[in-house]
Each structure stands twice: as C-alpha cells, then as structure tokens.
Amino acid sequence: MDFVLKMKDKSLKNRKLTREEGLRLFNSNLEELIKEANNIRKEIHGDGIDLCSIINGKSGRCGEDCAFCAQSKYHKTNISEYPLLDYEKIKKVAKENEDEGVHRFSIVTSGRGLYGEEFERVITYYSNLNKELKINLCASHGIINKESLIKLKKAGVKRYHHNLETSRNCYDKICKTHSYEERVKTIKNAKEAGLEVCSGGIIGLGETIIDRIDLAITLRELEIKSIPINVLSAIKGTKLQHMIPLNEEEILRTIAVFRFINPEAKIRLAGGRYLLKNFGENAFKAGANATITGNLLTTCGNKIKDDKRLIENIGMRIF
C-alpha cells in the first residue's frame, strides 16, 4: 500500500503516528499528501468550518521576551499600547461577531498573566457577556493557576487558549523569561478546571520540520481538540524581523501533517493567513477546518464576510 494511504488509514483508526512517519509524510508527494489530509478531515469532521474571533483587550508593555511578539517591552515596535479595555467596547465587538454568525469570541490580554483588579474586572466582563450574548466565550490571559481558571469557568468561559508556540527543544531559542513547562502546566490546569483548551503554535520561527512534528505530537499527547496554526508575520522591531516568510507549499505541508497526527482536532488557521493564496483557500483543502476571522492582535486578518464567501465558494459551510 502507498505510504500516504497507509498513514491515512492509521490516522483514521486513531493509531498514533510517530515522528519518523510524520517527517516522511512531510516530504511525500504534495498532491497526495493534501488529498489524503483532506479525506481525513472529511471522514471525521465533515464539511463544517468553525469560526472564532478575538479582541486585543490589553495591548503591549509585556514583560516577557518572546522573540516573535510585537507586544514585548524588549522590542521597539509601533503598536498601540493600552490597559484593559472597558466593558462596552468589548461587548460591542462581541455582539458584532455574534451577529455575523461567528461561533466563539475571546478576550486576549498581553503580559505574563492577568492579576488583581484587572483579573477581577475581566471575570465580570465574561459573566456579563455570558448573560447578555449567546456567543461561546473563550479566554486568553497567559500563564494562570487552576483557581483562576475555575473562576473563568464559573463566569461562563468555555475554552482557554494558550499556545505552546513551538517544540520543547526549540522553545528556549524564542523565549527566556518563562519555561515550556509553565505553558504545559497552564494547559493541564485548564483541563483540570473543566475547560476546553485551544493550543497550537507558530511556524516560520526558524524551527526545523522535526520541531513542528514534535509540537503536533505534544498537542496530541495533551489531547488538544482546537489547534491554531500561525505563520510568522515578521514584525519590524522584533528579534525575528528579518525572518524570510514561509512559502505556501511549506505551510500546506505543515497543515496536512498536523491533520494526520491530530485527526480528531480542529486545525485552525490563525495569524499569517495573508501569506496564503486567497487567505488560505488551499489550506481548507489540506486538512484545516477552522479559522480565526477578523483582525488579530497586532496584524490584520480577513474580514468575516470575506471568510464566509470563501468558505461557501469551496463547497464547505459554517456550522
């Protein structure tokens, strides 16, 4: 049996692919790889696309040194810096997304975490949003303990977002101010608190293909069911400002291999979609079945109406 077909059958039976198999898949025939990744997606998930959106609820002045991030105080970028937004501003954006048919909405805040008065304010925000709107609520507030996560859940949050960013082996090349294990612990805390978890990473940081495969396997081991894949936007003033953008083929290969390794998960297009033709049309044919829509934290995304049109044009549907 052809290797890619053999791996598809293994994936559909939920038998765990090895890193060696993942690497061989990455280097296999592109057309066949994409076709079978798409077949895995169809067989397990059907043709539905999950849409989520975010708001940059607190921007800049972050004390962490993540090499890719425009919000780090270690970088000189031209982003807007502001404290936690007021509730009405956040509610307005959440309501606009709900009215457009977006499934999930998350407040994202800069910094290692959110503490004290700001954390209590955001708990009130979620509680009010949960009462006033129907959109599913997600949260992204950095490294956090289980007690705080339980508070988020009680306030109506269903899912916590916390990316691993890259492999354990590569992590200290992009961040020195906190450890990979702290990120893993946050994910475990969220699961123990009864929250769903959204966690993925960024490709194009200078990592190897093996690093990407190791990330996909770690996410599988953590049983993550929503995996955002960001493609680095090299922002002027950051440590990675001179990184050469990935080409579309490499991005599609990565998405497809993530689908093989994580057949049950939603593979979510996130930052850097502008690097793909028509904001990722081919990615939805390579195993992706979810996307962040609208603007991101410090970069522009695709408009919701344009994403809805794109999804319709490729014969898929928003569920």
From Swiss-Prot:
GO terms for biological process: biotin biosynthetic process. Binds 1 [4Fe-4S] cluster. The cluster is coordinated with 3 cysteines and an exchangeable S-adenosyl-L-methionine. Binds 1 [2Fe-2S] cluster. The cluster is coordinated with 3 cysteines and 1 arginine. Residues 44-273 form the Radical SAM core domain. Pathway: Cofactor biosynthesis; biotin biosynthesis; biotin from 7,8-diaminononanoate: step 2/2. Its cofactor is [4Fe-4S] cluster; [2Fe-2S] cluster. The keyword NAD does not apply. GO terms for molecular function: 2 iron, 2 sulfur cluster binding; 4 iron, 4 sulfur cluster binding; biotin synthase activity; iron ion binding. Its EC number is 2.8.1.6. Keywords: 2Fe-2S, 4Fe-4S, Biotin biosynthesis, Iron, Iron-sulfur, Metal-binding, S-adenosyl-L-methionine, Transferase. It comes from the Bacteria. [2Fe-2S] cluster binds at residues 106, 138, 198, 268. It catalyses: (4R,5S)-dethiobiotin + (sulfur carrier)-SH + 2 reduced [2Fe-2S]-[ferredoxin] + 2 S-adenosyl-L-methionine = (sulfur carrier)-H + biotin + 2 5'-deoxyadenosine + 2 L-methionine + 2 oxidized [2Fe-2S]-[ferredoxin]. Homodimer. HAMAP family: BioB (MF_01694). NCBIfam families: bioB. Belongs to the radical SAM superfamily. Biotin synthase family. This is Biotin synthase. It comes from Clostridium perfringens (strain ATCC 13124 / DSM 756 / JCM 1290 / NCIMB 6125 / NCTC 8237 / Type A). The lineage of its organism: Bacteria, Bacillati, Bacillota, Clostridia, Eubacteriales.
